[in-house]
Amino acid sequence: APVNEDCLLPKKVGPCRAAVPRFYYNSDSGKCEGFTYGGCHANANNFKTKDECKNACH
C-alpha cells in the first residue's frame, strides 16, 4: 500500500460539469488510472499526469 494516505482517498469527480482528464490512484488495482474530473471540489487523490500520480503513490 502507498505510504501517502492521499492515495487511499476515493476517486472524487466533484459536482461541477467540466470534463478535465485527471489521474487517481486506485487502491483496489494498485495502479494510477484515468478519470474525468468535474473541475471543482477535488480531493488530494487527483493528479494532472499519470507520472505525477505514480511519483506520489507508488
Swiss-Prot record:
- What's the miscellaneous note? Does not inhibit potassium channels (Kv), as well as cysteine proteases (papain and bromelain). Is not active against kallikrein.
Q: Which GO terms describe its cellular component?
A: extracellular space; nematocyst
What's this protein's name?
PI-actitoxin-Axm2a
Q: Where found, per UniProt?
A: Secreted; Nematocyst
Q: Give expression by tissue.
A: Expressed by acrorhagi.
Its keywords, alphabetically, are: Disulfide bond, Nematocyst, Protease inhibitor, Secreted, Serine protease inhibitor
Among PROSITE patterns, the record links this protein to: BPTI_KUNITZ_1, BPTI_KUNITZ_2
Gene3D superfamilies for the chain: Pancreatic trypsin inhibitor Kunitz domain
What family does the entry list?
Belongs to the venom Kunitz-type family. Sea anemone type 2 potassium channel toxin subfamily.
Functionally, this protein is described as follows:
Serine protease inhibitor that is strongly active against trypsin (1900 IU/mg) and moderately active against plasmin. Also shows weak inhibition against chymotrypsin (70%), elastase (38%) and the metalloprotease thermolysin (14%).
Pfam families on file: Kunitz_BPTI
Q: Which SMART domains match?
A: KU
BPTI/Kunitz inhibitor domain residues are 7-57
Site positions per UniProt: Reactive bond for trypsin: 17-18
List GO molecular-function terms, semicolon-separated.
serine-type endopeptidase inhibitor activity
The disulfides recorded in the entry are 7-57, 16-40, 32-53
